[in-house]
Amino acid sequence: MKKWFSSISKKKVSFSTLLLLGSGIVLSSCSNIDKPNVFRTLSQQSVENKVDYSKLPKENKTVRNLVFGTAEYNDGNYVLVVTTETDSSQINFLNGSNNQAVSTENWAGDLGTTVKQVQNRYSTYPKGVKFLIWNDIDPNPVKWNPFARYPVIASDNELAKQTDKDNSDKLRRNDESAIQYREIVTFIQTVYSGSVNNLINQSNVHAQTVGTDVTKAIVIAFRKNNLDQISAHFYNPDNSNGSNAPGSNQPNQDSGNNGSTTPAAPAAAAAKKSYSAGSFGVKRHAVQVSINFLNFLDSVYTPLN
């Protein structure tokens, strides 16, 4: 054991890596986490042309590398988005509507309007800032969140139907999209722990109303500085005044996670910039929806003006 710790110290492995080793993250492998071609690229052109999510081009980097933060994609400067078209707030973030019937092909929500606004905005980055998205779409007519469960029914409840007893506390969905969503969300929770503490609203897991917010949209902005350090910044769509999740502001010196098992360090919130609605020449309510997201991105990346 002493020899093992001695070898670890000589290699200067970070404390966060030791935590990952202890939790088994480095050694674990979910079926979807190490797959390439899972996330899709969302560009300004795709938003303007209202390209359907299923037709967006796929990125060949694995979920694991993208979640850890990698310079192999766009030199480490990208925004990772994970959503589900089952919760009203996330539908609004994608489409600007709370209606499940509205498809992401319109991209009229906070995400799409901001993607259009940041085109060429961060000129200090040679390749700019790119957006990657993975979106859960329930193939069933009644669309439930992947973490939604059936109500808890006591086995000795004489008034309950047997089917309700059999389904008690079971997951409502086990389709491919739901399984993939749960794996990705759980992996992000495990890697970044405290930065995504309130991602799942446990009080709504057993809700019987379709569209109830069970999870939040996950938005992680990765940035590489001139020391080849990549840091992870978390956006909270429900809290415009405190968009970045708490965490260390000391990024890891990691040239893109090439062979590294250390995820990008969560970064502390930076001061927000404010902009007037008239600055963008679009409808006031649309700008008001996206301005918080733009402020968040400006706190991570250097704006053009």
Swiss-Prot record:
Membrane topology value: Lipid-anchor
InterPro entries: DUF6856
Signal peptide (UniProt feature, chain positions): 1-29
Annotated segments matching region Disordered: 234-265
PROSITE patterns, per the entry: PROKAR_LIPOPROTEIN
Annotated localization: Cell membrane
Pfam families in alphabetical order: DUF6856
Keywords carried by this UniProt record: Cell membrane, Lipoprotein, Membrane, Palmitate, Signal
GO cellular component, one term: plasma membrane
Lipid linkage positions (N-palmitoyl cysteine): C30
Biased segments, Polar residues type: 237-258
Keyword flag Acetylation: no
Residues bearing a lipid moiety (S-diacylglycerol cysteine): C30
Residues annotated as transmembrane: none
Designated name of the protein: Uncharacterized lipoprotein MG348 homolog
Organism: Mycoplasma pneumoniae (strain ATCC 29342 / M129 / Subtype 1)
